Every structure is written in structure tokens, then in C-alpha cells.
Amino acid sequence: HECCKKGFCDPGCDCCDQ
């Protein structure tokens, strides 16, 4: 996900927990 690569988490993205 883009949010993971950019270092932030968009609504609905669980990359913060990955």
C-alpha cells in the first residue's frame, strides 16, 4: 500500500499494524 511506503496510514488501511 502507498500509505505503508510513505510512512503514514490512510483510513481503511491496516498497514500501521503490519
Curated annotation (Swiss-Prot):
Keywords: Disulfide bond, Secreted, Toxin. Expressed by the venom duct. One of its GO terms (cellular component) is extracellular region. The keyword Coiled coil does not apply. It is found in: Secreted. Its main location: secreted. Disulfide bonds join C3-C15, C4-C13, C9-C16. GO terms for molecular function: toxin activity. Belongs to the conotoxin M superfamily. The cysteine framework is III (CC-C-C-CC). This is Conotoxin pc3a. It comes from Conus pictus (Cone snail).
